[in-house]
Amino acid sequence: MVGKRNLPVISRNFDLSPGVLRFSASRLRLKKGEKKPKFTKDTSAKLPKLQRNGTKFALGHSKTVTLRKTLTPGTVLIVLAGRHKGKRVVFLKQLPQSGLLLVTGPHKINGFPLRRIGQAFVIATSLKVNVSGVKIPEHINDEYFKRKSTAQKTGKNIFASGKTEYTVSEQRKKDIKTVDAPILAAIKKHPEHKFLFGYLGTRFSLGKNQYPHKMQF
């Protein structure tokens, strides 16, 4: 085989004058754009599933929200978010459709009404109240807590009518008294009922050198 001839390497850049080159450093390192790759859609990816109870959704099948083992009926919970954060409430049951927790203050002790809350926003304590005598009416479900929109689609100015404030209905007040009555009776029968009334009536707070991850609730 005939070997390759050692040809001299001639650079494209050369001195036009002392200290002045023909091409700059950025000009020599210029790289042309490459062809854009074609996008192929990945059809193997599965659609995410919504963790909801009840009806099926378009993105996937519904999944039952599992309840934490520490959340049993009668457990005293500490609310972590919302206007009532820090208050101690009594857990009644889990609503089947949404998976939210049905809790009450009772309202007479700490002003916490009958309402729903997610289990991610509560801390379960070791204290329990006997709620075996509580009978929750059948109409108290997820639809019961949904507020009806008062806005009407009209051509009038929406700012002229002013803001409509929410008012508690008489039916809601009656239901709160019905549910809270047996709970108050069970607290009064407790050997340490004075402590329970004071415990439920005060908000939870952290003092100096108190760390929640080191506390036993």
UniProtKB/Swiss-Prot annotation:
Gene Ontology cellular component list: cytosolic large ribosomal subunit; rough endoplasmic reticulum
One GO molecular-function entry: RNA binding
InterPro entries per UniProt: 60S_ribosomal_eL6 (IPR000915), Rib_uL2_dom2 (IPR014722), Ribosomal_eL6_CS (IPR049633), Ribosomal_eL6_KOW (IPR041997), Translation_prot_SH3-like_sf (IPR008991)
UniProt key word Ribonucleoprotein: yes
Keywords (A to Z) from UniProt: Cytoplasm, Endoplasmic reticulum, Ribonucleoprotein, Ribosomal protein
PANTHER family: 60S RIBOSOMAL PROTEIN L6 (PTHR10715), LARGE RIBOSOMAL SUBUNIT PROTEIN EL6 (PTHR10715:SF0)
Protein name: Large ribosomal subunit protein eL6
